[in-house]
Design a protein with these regions (language model features):
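Well-ordered beta-strand segments characteristic of repetitive beta-sheet solenoids
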Residues: 141, 174, 200-203
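Glycine-rich flavin
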Residues: 21-160
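Alpha-helical interface subdomain recognition
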Residues: 1-71, 192-333
Length: 333
């Protein structure tokens, strides 16, 4: 299995990074915190023109999400990309709106909020901790019963939920006889893909914490020397870099396993989630420490990655659930 990036993936990375550097500097990420969904419309349309919602293979989508995570991009990117995958080949207005960046889609993946009921095409029930719920125009529900596309119309109520991560707001979505469209997609495959792409987004954030720490360690001086010359700081940065590479390797392996339909795909996805969550939580905390007292201030961006790491740990296939899955798979082996 070749895990090295292809020239096409390198080209995607360069293109996406240039776009995000121009359109989503950290100042704009901060400005979008608490903004309504309409504030995202120009960004979504520009991203669609660049092909963000095109039908790429999972390994190429992973590159996209690494860059989104590196930029700490706010908004329901994961839900929209997974919805585009579920709608691939569709020709109706709903599909065209997603592909064209006119519709933002939030993903209802984690079964938090109790069971959902579907009767005569009408959905009822609640999903909590839905990332980007308040910014979405529609919802993609991935459930044991199948894959449902639900426009945000009558019968759909969204309530904002207090969240540690202001760059990635969450909400509670209540469906009351909401109209749905059942999609002929494999729910298990979409679930695996969603967790892999969430891991890829985390990998980008993990890598960015390494960059931030190394950059700061080169310029911040104590006792007449850059702090990066001191063993305590340089070893911490080295440990961060190792965790970043482990997380990236596990996520690439999981992406390839899912793409190729490997028998152990579920196992690899769970491993990637656990390793990425552990790495992100630790790297984000170490990044704050490497910045010293400044790292604890609102003005320093380090705390934003701490908050994103906490949100990643608890959503889109939470780490604790993946650990339970790994234990069950080991016992069944």
């Amino acid at each position: 299995m070749d895990l090295m990036p292809t020239p096409e993936q390198d080209a995607i990375r360069d293109s996406v990074r240039a776009f995000l550097d121009a359109e989503l500097p950290m100042s704009r990420v901060r400005a979008l915190c608490g903004a309504a969904g309409d504030a995202y419309a120009p960004l979504w349309r520009a991203a669609a023109e660049l092909g963000f919602f095109a039908d790429y293979a999972l390994t190429e989508q992973m590159v996209l999400f690494e860059e989104l995570g590196r930029a700490l991009a706010p908004g329901p990117w994961l839900g929209t990309v997974i919805a585009a995958q579920a709608l691939a080949g569709g020709t109706d207005a709903a599909a065209a709106a997603v592909f064209g960046g006119e519709t933002r889609v939030a993903l209802c993946l984690d079964p938090v909020g109790g069971p959902l009921t579907l009767r005569s095409g009408r959905l009822s029930g609640t999903r909590r901790a839905v990332l980007g719920a308040g910014l979405a125009d529609a919802f993609l529900v991935v459930d044991d019963a199948g894959v449902l596309f639900v426009p945000r119309d009558a019968g759909v109520r969204v309530e904002a939920t207090p969240s540690l991560d202001a760059t990635n707001p969450v909400g509670t979505v209540t469906f009351t006889d909401a109209a749905t469209t059942r999609l002929p997609s494999d729910a298990a495959l979409l679930r695996r893909a969603a967790v892999v792409l969430a891991c890829a987004e985390a990998v980008g954030g993990i890598a960015r914490t390494v960059e931030m720490s190394v950059e700061y360690a080169k310029v911040r001086q104590q006792f007449g020397k850059p702090i990066g010359s001191f063993q305590a700081v340089k070893h911490r940065c080295a440990d961060m870099a190792v965790r970043a590479e482990v997380a990236r390797s596990a996520t690439i392996y999981a992406a390839v396993s899912v793409r190729d339909g490997a028998a152990d795909a579920d196992f690899q996805v769970s491993v990637a989630k656990v390793l990425c969550a552990n790495a992100y939580l630790q790297n984000a905390a170490d990044n704050v420490q490497n910045h010293g007292g400044m790292g604890f201030t609102w003005e320093c961006d380090a705390h934003l990655f701490v908050k994103r790491s906490r949100a990643f740990d608890a959503t889109i296939g939470p780490r604790r659930a993946q650990l339970d899955s790994l234990v069950a798979q080991f016992r069944a082996a």
